[in-house]
Amino acid sequence: MTELLPDSVTSSVFLRRDALAAGVSHAAIAAAVRDGDWVRLRHGAYVAGDLFRRASAEERHALLARAVVRQSQTEVVLSHLSAVPEYGGPLWGVPADVVHVTRLDRRAGRKEAGVRQHQGLLQDGDVVLRNGVAVTSPTRTLIDVTTCAQLEAALVIVNDLLHRRLTTLADARQRYETMQHHPYTLKTDLVLRLADPRIESVGETRTFIVCWRQGLPAPVPQWAVNDDLGHEFARLDLAWPEYKVWLEFDGREKYTKFRREGESVIDAVLREKKRESKIAELTGWRCIRITWDDLADPVRLAARIAAVLRLAA
């Protein structure tokens, strides 16, 4: 069905009025949705079914957000959590069905299901064009996220933005100083204190938070290990050098997304085991390996880490 529409329409989100203007009937639209050729993102907004099915959770949110922007009756920019996918960031632990926008006219917006309109004052440099859509800058997005997401979810996003050098802690703190009148910024202080650009992944951030909440010694992210010649051999996800213990987070990406060319999952697992053995040989340290399932029970995970640290002390 999408072949009836121009490429400029079907390449992303299109509205019912776009389809009607292209000569597609109401009945044909209904049939396209029923057959899965189109997916309805929200009332009157669609995307090609194959594009939607290939999309990640973050990409699907970005499609939904574009639908909201296209249907908005006033000028808005994607902001807060809805700005994150435009920078390729993760949306962990947050509602993916709510789109956040900031109005440029600073007026109070009408309540609408699935849309949260913000009235925040946007200063020079706070809005950029990203992927063809107006969105808050990485620095402004970082600050805004801390005001609308829970601590752990916010820190996941903040660390990601910092690690990929889309902004810096210095820039974030400077921008935050100009927003002290902004509501809900008390949590921002804490997030900025906990943030660490060395932390690379969602799993590492969540593990760091477990340690902090359970009163464990703070681990050092990305600890470098050198070989016998003094060359860097590996970087450890999280480490406690004083205890000679390190932690590796075994997320699925380690064995799928980051596989080497021609390497099977089994090959990747074996390579990781050899790497662990070599690190232990070079350092004499003990390794703790955890997975997503471990993070589902933070108290139990903290007890496990604490037990290893006690033995090593």
Regions found by a protein language model. Name each.
Residues 7-10, 25, 162-313:
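Surface segments flanking catalytic/ligand-binding clefts of nucleic-acid enzymes
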Residues 1-186, 310-313:
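Short gly/ser-rich loop at a beta-strand->alpha-helix junction or flexible surface loop bordering the NTP-binding
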